[in-house]
Amino acid sequence: LVARYPSIASPLVILARGYSRELPGNTHAEANALAKARTLSPERLSEMFPSAEEETPRGPDIDDVLAHTDVYTTLEPCSVRTSGLAPCADALVAAKVPRCFIGVGEPDDFVQCEGAQKLRAAGCQVVWVKGLEEECLSAARRGRQT
């Protein structure tokens, strides 16, 4: 998750990173990154975004920060979870993430995915990163349990 907060002119800040199965349970990268971002204290957010206090006396709020955050992901955010957990696309929509950069679509042998469509329908700009598809798919398959 890369934040552009409080304004588009502010420097980029890496808010959180995540990878599949990083946190307990059958967790995915986007959900893990969001969960980790939500653990940032108000003090830490103020350190990361000092100019936010000029715009908001209370300092940055994680929901405001996420609404100015770009997501970079190797694999299309899932739209269906066979584990019963919430799909990553739904979590990104709930966080009001405005833009998602995706390295490769989820292959049919994983699950039928409509993550990019869900994001677009919610007003999130989806950017397909060209030229890294094979590397992204290879990374996704390495972590896949068959």
Which residues does each predicted region cover?
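Short beta-strand scaffold segments in enzyme catalytic cores
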Residues: L1-S10
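Zn2+-dependent cytidine deaminase-like catalytic core
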Residues: I14-L137
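Short, surface-exposed amphipathic charged segments that create phosphate/polyanion-binding patches used
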Residues: A116, A139-T146
